[in-house]
Amino acid sequence: MINLHSAKISEHTSIIAKEKKVRLVLKLFQKRFAKRFSKVCIEGRDIGTVILPKADIKFFFKCDLSTAAKRRFKELKKKNKKIKFQIVKKQLQIRNFRDVSRKNSPLLKSSDAVIVNTEKLRKIPDMMKKMSEIVEKKIRSKYGS
């Protein structure tokens, strides 16, 4: 099974994502996929600005480089990956730079996205609880209680 969040995949993703033809094909696929469902949750670095700019709810995850690198390093260590922390941090820094500076579909925060600062959230259930509260509030405001 392929792990889409592996270091190797992450490293190549930001390089491939710069290619205009690749972005066009993926954009078309993602938009078609989203239209097939009345409710959909899609994760990606340009989903809220390019793929689904009119989505009801958009989250923009924010985390400082050191915290993100520590989490990624810990994740890789669990998988017995022999890698140094400084390398993980540098790889994340390069990927982030590529994503925000690429010409085609750069990483941007849409004006209506909810910022989720994950620096202080130590566990996934904490983050899920916060996001669920935001979704429930949005549903109540749009459809009533």
Where does each model-flagged region fall?
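Anionic, Ser/Thr-rich low-complexity intrinsically disordered regions
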Residues: 46, 60, 67, 83-91, ...
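Residue-level signature of catalytic and energy-coupling elements of molecular machines
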Residues: 4, 26, 41, 92, ...
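Glycine/charge-rich, flexible interdomain linkers and switch-proximal surface loops
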Residues: 42-50, 89, 105-112
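NTP-dependent small-molecule kinase module
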Residues: 1-5, 10-11, 73-79, 97-145
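ATP-dependent NMP and nucleoside kinases share a basic, alpha-helical "lid"
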Residues: 17-79
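Metal-dependent phosphoesterase signature
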Residues: 5-23
